[in-house]
């Protein structure tokens, strides 16, 4: 049974699962689907097009599936998909998709800290930690288990690899490959995210191989030559393949 405050508004066409808690001054719009066991504290707004899983907690001021901040948007029907077990803190805003991709996606088991923004058509993986006041422009992609510290600004269309860590206050105009620390101004490669990799259970052998991959990529002539040297020299584990595929498919170029 859902617990809905008499001071909340739930549109009659909204679809709610079971055991949800909806606090005072929450607003649930039409064309909304919500799973089970979600907690919406006071003053949470769930806009049209929201597709929310289960076991999420939304803190005061969170606004989900807002109208995209895109002048090309013409009111097309799009969605914002949120997975399970997310903690979405105070004043987080997540825009729904546009005609470009049709939906914004937030995976599962993420912590989105207060006052951060997820732009239209972004695709966020799972296991992410994104710090206070970090802003993601439209169509940003972040792979699983990345960490973005506070006040990070990410340019539209950027791709951030899994297990990467971006230092606080950084500006990211280019793609950030997996497993690394990115920092300084302008943004640069600052070594591997060794502490994060160890915490996630990576072995010394895996970490050493990732290190050697970047050593060859960044120190062997051109990037193309570095990729060729990696393929000739190192075993093609899933970590190495992930790095090479990320670099080869980068649309904005990678930080160096």
Regions found by a protein language model. Give the residues of each.
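Terminal amphipathic alpha-helical/low-complexity segments used for targeting or macromolecular assembly
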Residues: 1-7, 12-13, 18-19, 55, ...
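Structural signal for interior beta-strand "rungs" in well-ordered beta-sheet cores
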Residues: 3-183, 187-188
């Amino acid at each position: 049974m859902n617990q809905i405050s008499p001071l909340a508004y739930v549109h009659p066409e909204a679809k709610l699962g079971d055991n949800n808690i909806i606090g005072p001054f929450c607003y649930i719009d039409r064309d909304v689907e919500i799973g089970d066991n979600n907690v919406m504290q006071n003053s949470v707004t769930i806009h049209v097009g929201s597709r929310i899983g289960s076991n999420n907690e939304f803190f005061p001021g969170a606004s989900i599936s807002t109208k995209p901040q895109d002048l090309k948007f013409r009111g097309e029907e799009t969605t914002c998909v949120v997975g399970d077990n997310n903690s979405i803190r105070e004043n987080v805003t997540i825009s729904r998709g546009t005609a470009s991709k049709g939906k914004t996606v937030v995976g599962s088991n993420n912590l989105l800290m207060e006052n951060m923004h997820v732009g239209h058509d972004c695709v966020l993986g799972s296991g992410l930690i994104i710090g206070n006041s970090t802003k993601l422009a439209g169509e940003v992609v972040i792979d699983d288990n990345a960490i973005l510290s506070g006040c990070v600004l990410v340019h539209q269309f950027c791709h951030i690899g899994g297990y990467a860590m971006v230092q606080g206050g950084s500006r990211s105009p280019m793609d950030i490959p997996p497993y690394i620390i990115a920092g300084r101004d302008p943004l640069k490669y600052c070594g591997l995210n060794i502490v994060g990799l160890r915490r996630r259970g990576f072995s010394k052998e895996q970490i050493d191989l990732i290190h050697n991959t970047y050593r060859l990529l960044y120190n062997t002539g051109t990037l193309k030559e570095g990729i060729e040297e990696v393929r000739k020299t190192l075993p093609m584990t899933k970590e190495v393949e992930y790095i090479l595929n990320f670099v080869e498919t980068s649309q904005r170029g990678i930080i160096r």
